[in-house]
Curated annotation (Swiss-Prot):
GO cellular component, one term: plasma membrane
Keyword Glycoprotein: yes
Magnesium as UniProt keyword: no
Glycosylated sites: 418, 436, 487, 567
General function of this protein: Potential calcium-dependent cell-adhesion protein. May be involved in the establishment and maintenance of specific neuronal connections in the brain.
Pfam families with a match to the protein in the record: Cadherin, Cadherin_2, Cadherin_C_2
Entry protein name: Protocadherin beta-12
UniProt cross-references to Gene3D superfamilies, sorted A to Z: Cadherins
Source organism per UniProt: Homo sapiens (Human)
Length: 795
């Protein structure tokens, strides 16, 4: 209808344009007509000639015709009579919607001269539409505690008619709880409200339904209806009530577990969560809670433990039903246990001994009595146990039996026996009773802890941090309980010189080993000790294992130059004749390294020289030799700096400074001091100084060597009882030489060395080979170890 109203507005605008146009061209008259909607096509509207004061012949002669702006010809003109007739049925609601009045504008076009005559056609509404509710069913949720007089809004009905034919009133079918009140909104439309006349009660009537009727003002009036459902929202104002205040049931004493005993049921007049009930035992004894169980949702009471008529003949249980709001009701259930005499054999246990010690022979495990209430053959019984277990049955008087062990048991082989004692009568049919017992074998401390390895090899790099975890040992015990709990300990060292307590410690609970202090490979290359594992049994059993700790060398010592001495005194000066051939041995740099292995492999190189290319240093042995022939252009004095570097990671190094003096011959040597003597000094004084210097240097060097050897021998003598071991080395590089004496060279190449101070060539004299002293090795070691040794010099 809104679309119809918009179209009508456009029609009016176009008609207005034509009217204005006609008025501008010629004078015009307006004709007003009234017609009821829904008239049939061809119905008479009015006489145009009479209304406008025209002759009928004029309409015909001037070609009068009716036009509209939307080319929709609703009217037709009979030029013979001047009557306006309906060309089609008019629907006011389609043409104008809810607008009132509904006026259509047309023009009568006449020629000679051209003239527009305005026609206004008012379409009168008839009551051709009934009120309609958009929703055929309305749902209202109203709390049952709503006060009387409360107002609830209802949906209004829609009526396409207007005016008096629109919705006029609302009614509901009579009821005691509600009435309808009519309200008018600002656009003059009427809408209904539902007023509560009587308090609601969910338990009395949880839902009300009635018909809402909308009436229009037409004649005859039309109506529309909708169903109104009022759902009363419950509040928790009712306590649960049981179907029975007292339940009495009977149950056989041999009922199986899980059997349904009885189902209790209660209801609650409330709704929603207020009517959701849960069932529980109220103030039930421990026997009741052990024997029975109630389903909180369904109220099913089931059996959870065997019944014994001889022990308890009946149970009285108070059941409580609680709703979601906290209100509750109670009922009593009496359960009568019915005795069953099935005449099956019975086993009465007098005593059971479990667990039993594993190493005790012929131990009585169980004493029991059997009986059958029948008589004759039906009362005669045979008692038996399985044959594949180390137990026997022994009969006694009055049907008493004892179950005994046949031989000593071994818990480590089998710690538990499930034994079925079967008693069968001789009746027809034969009935039998089985009694199952579980016999546990208690542990006896008959197994000592066993280490996972007979010996352990642990590696730790020197200069470690104190309290460093260096490894773990582990032992297991086949026993159980406290007999299987193992404590670890360090056993007293067999070497009285080994300070074991200050070297390592052990965690008594888990066997973790820790180095207590920083280890020095040069002082201690390895040591071994024994550890013990003791269980907590009585008496306690223990076992031992050997632990070897191998100290790995770290490059923590720089090379030390033995010759020439670098002690800040007068430098060493070597004399070289001018006639020396290439490769002439000037001197030999001697150095040692306190480390071992590749950390002690030394290489030599010339770092600085006064005359580059004149001298060279052999990388293997530190020999300083001439590289070419000497010439007159060469300086007489030369200063050489030799770099000594080990092969560690990172490498360490030291330098040695040499002074070389070129002389014509050795008969009259010339040895200047580091500071040049005055030019006027006599040759005799220079010779004296040179001899004194050489003697001093040789004495200092010899004294240093002896002192160093003595210190090393003292340290070796103290460390020798502790035991020394060397880690297997890699291949020895061809460009390196080992002079440390710590075991990095092949054993056949270890010699004592002495520098001959009186020789101008400063060569070495090899006095005697050093024979390695092998310590005996233990058998069964997991890691192949080099036998520890030390040399006479202690390098």
């Amino acid at each position: 209808m809104e679309n119809g109203g918009a179209g009508t507005l456009q029609i009016r605008q176009v008609l207005l344009f034509f009217v204005l146009l006609g008025m501008s061209q010629a004078g015009s008259e307006t004709g007003n007509f009234l017609v009821m909607e829904e008239l049939q096509s061809g119905s008479f509207v009015g006489n145009l000639a009479k209304t406008l004061g025209l002759e009928v012949s004029e309409l015909s002669s001037r070609g009068a015709r009716v036009v509209s702006n939307d080319n929709k010809e609703c009217l037709q003109l009979d030029t013979n009579t001047g009557d306006l007739l309906l060309r089609e049925m008019l629907d006011r609601e389609e043409l104008c919607g809810s607008n009132e009045p509904c006026v259509l504008y047309f023009q009568v076009l006449m020629k000679n001269p051209t003239q527009f005559l305005q026609i206004e056609l008012q379409v009168r509404d008839i009551n051709d539409h009934s009120p309609v509710f958009l929703e055929k069913e309305m749902l209202l949720e109203i709390p049952e505690n709503s006060p009387v007089g409360a107002v609830f809004l209802l949906e209004s009905a829609k009526d396409l008619d207007v005016g008096i034919n629109a919705v006029k009133s609302y009614t509901i079918n009579p009821n005691s709880h509600f009435h309808v009140k009519i309200r008018v909104n600002p656009d003059n439309r009427k809408y209904p409200e539902l007023v509560l006349d009587k308090a609601l009660d969910y338990e009395e009537r949880p839902e009300l339904s009635f018909i809402l009727t909308a009436l229009d003002g037409g004649s005859p009036p039309r109506s529309g209806t909708a169903l109104v459902r009022v759902v009363v929202v419950d509040i928790n104002d009712n306590s649960p009530e049981f179907e029975q205040a007292f339940y009495e049931v009977k149950i056989l004493e041999n009922s199986i577990l899980g059997s349904l005993v009885v189902t209790v049921s209660a209801w609650d007049l409330d709704s929603g969560t207020n009517s959701e009930l849960s069932y529980t035992f109220s103030h039930a004894s421990e026997d009741i809670r052990k024997t029975f169980e109630i389903n909180q949702k369904s109220g099913d009471i089931t059996l959870t433990a065997p019944l014994d008529f001889e022990a308890i003949e009946s149970y009285s249980i108070i059941i409580q039903a609680t709703d979601g709001g906290g209100l509750f009701g109670k009922s009593t259930v009496r359960i009568q246990v019915m005795d069953v005499n099935d005449n099956a054999p019975e086993i009465t246990v007098s005593s059971i001994t479990s667990p039993i010690p594993e190493n005790t022979p012929e131990t009585v495990v169980m004493v029991f009595r059997i009986r059958d209430r029948d008589s004759g053959d039906n009362g005669k019984m045979v008692c038996s146990i399985p044959e594949d277990i180390p137990f026997v049955l022994k009969s006694s008087v009055n049907n008493y039996y004892t179950l005994e062990t046949e031989r000593p048991l071994d818990r480590e082989s089998r710690a538990e026996y499930n034994i079925t004692i079967t008693v069968t009568d001789l009746g027809t049919p034969r009935l039998k009773t089985e009694h199952n017992i579980t016999v546990l074998v208690s542990d006896v401390n008959d197994n000592a802890p066993a280490f996972t390895q007979t010996s352990y090899a642990l590696f730790v790099r020197e200069n470690n941090s104190p309290a460093l975890h260096i490894g773990s040992i582990s032992a297991t015990d086949r026993d159980s309980g406290t007999n299987a709990q193992v404590n670890y300990s360090l056993l007293p060292s067999q070497d009285p010189h080994l300070p074991l307590a200050s070297l390592v410690s052990i965690n008594a609970d888990n066997g973790h080993l820790f180095a207590l202090r920083s280890l020095d490979y040069e002082a201690l290359q390895g040591f071994q000790f024994r550890v013990g594992a003791t269980d907590h049994g009585s008496p306690a059993l223990s076992s031992e294992a050997l632990v070897r700790v191998l100290v790995l060398d770290a490059n923590d010592n720089s090379p030390f130059v033995l010759y020439p001495l670098q002690n800040g005194s007068a430098p060493c000066t070597e004399l070289v004749p001018w006639a020396a051939e290439p490769g002439y041995l000037v001197t030999k740099v001697v150095a040692v390294d306190g480390d071992s292995g590749q950390n002690a492999w030394l290489s030599y190189q010339l770092l600085k020289a006064t005359e580059p290319g004149l001298f060279g240093v052999w990388a293997h042995n530190g020999e300083v030799r001439t590289a070419r022939l000497l010439s007159e252009r060469d300086a007489a004095k030369h200063r050489l700096v030799v770099l000594v570097k080990d092969n560690g990671e990172p490498p360490r190094s030291a330098t040695a400074t040499l002074h070389v003096l070129l002389v014509d011959g050795f008969s009259q040597p010339y040895l200047p001091l580091p500071e040049a003597a005055p030019a006027q000094a006599q040759a005799d004084s220079l010779t004296v100084y040179l001899v004194v210097a050489l003697a001093s240097v040789s004495s200092l060097f010899l004294f240093s060597v002896l002192l160093f050897v003595a210190v090393r021998l003292c340290r070796r003598s103290r460390a020798a009882p502790v035991g020394r071991c060397s880690v297997p080395e890699g291949p020895f590089p061809g460009h390196l030489v080992d002079v440390s004496g710590t075991g990095t060279l092949s054993q056949s190449y270890h010699y004592e060395v002495c520098v001959t101070g009186g020789s101008r060539s400063n060569k070495f004299k090899f006095l005697k080979p050093i024979i390695p002293n092998f310590l005996p090795q233990s058998t069964g070691s997991e890691v192949e170890e080099n036998p520890p040794f030390q040399n006479n010099l202690g390098f």
